[in-house]
Amino acid sequence: MYNKVIMIGRLTAKPEMVKTPTDKSVTRATVAVNRRFKGSNGEREADFINVVMWGRLAETLASYGTKGSLISVDGELRTRKYEKDGQTHYITEVLASSFQLLESRSQRAMRENNISGDLSDLVLEEEELPF
């Protein structure tokens, strides 16, 4: 049997880390992953996939991940259940074994500041040039 998930998407919110009662770090995040096809309205639909990270992985994502960060996640699919008001509820999520942030700091800063990557209209006066 083989259980492997690999996905690339964007974080929907800033990941928040919490400590368990036994002092283990855990971070939960949601990754928006675009589907390969467009919906009936002509727009690309997305799936919102819950991800769980533990330990150093959780601490690292909480420190460096931001809303909108492009991320690659490797892990395995897990289902857990709990009882509430006599009803059994199931939660399916990815238990991450590794992740990689796929944007440089400058790309992230441009995205966060809504700056386009196209600088063709940029005009500098001669006295503004650093050389």
Curated annotation (Swiss-Prot):
<dbReference type="InterPro" id="IPR000424">
    <property type="entry name" value="Primosome_PriB/ssb"/>
</dbReference>
<comment type="subunit">
    <text>Homotetramer.</text>
</comment>
<dbReference type="Pfam" id="PF00436">
    <property type="entry name" value="SSB"/>
</dbReference>
<dbReference type="InterPro" id="IPR012340">
    <property type="entry name" value="NA-bd_OB-fold"/>
</dbReference>
<feature type="domain" description="SSB">
    <location>
        <begin position="1"/>
        <end position="103"/>
    </location>
</feature>
<dbReference type="GO" id="GO:0003697">
    <property type="term" value="F:single-stranded DNA binding"/>
</dbReference>
<comment type="function">
    <text>Plays an important role in DNA replication, recombination and repair. Binds to ssDNA and to an array of partner proteins to recruit them to their sites of action during DNA metabolism.</text>
</comment>
<dbReference type="GO" id="GO:0006310">
    <property type="term" value="P:DNA recombination"/>
</dbReference>
<keyword id="KW-0233">DNA recombination</keyword>
<dbReference type="InterPro" id="IPR011344">
    <property type="entry name" value="ssDNA-bd"/>
</dbReference>
<dbReference type="GO" id="GO:0006281">
    <property type="term" value="P:DNA repair"/>
</dbReference>
<keyword id="KW-0227">DNA damage</keyword>
<dbReference type="GO" id="GO:0009295">
    <property type="term" value="C:nucleoid"/>
</dbReference>
<keyword id="KW-0235">DNA replication</keyword>
<protein>
    <recommendedName>
        <fullName>Single-stranded DNA-binding protein 2</fullName>
    </recommendedName>
</protein>
<keyword id="KW-0238">DNA-binding</keyword>
<feature type="short sequence motif" description="Important for interaction with partner proteins">
    <location>
        <begin position="126"/>
        <end position="131"/>
    </location>
</feature>
<dbReference type="GO" id="GO:0006260">
    <property type="term" value="P:DNA replication"/>
</dbReference>
<keyword id="KW-0234">DNA repair</keyword>
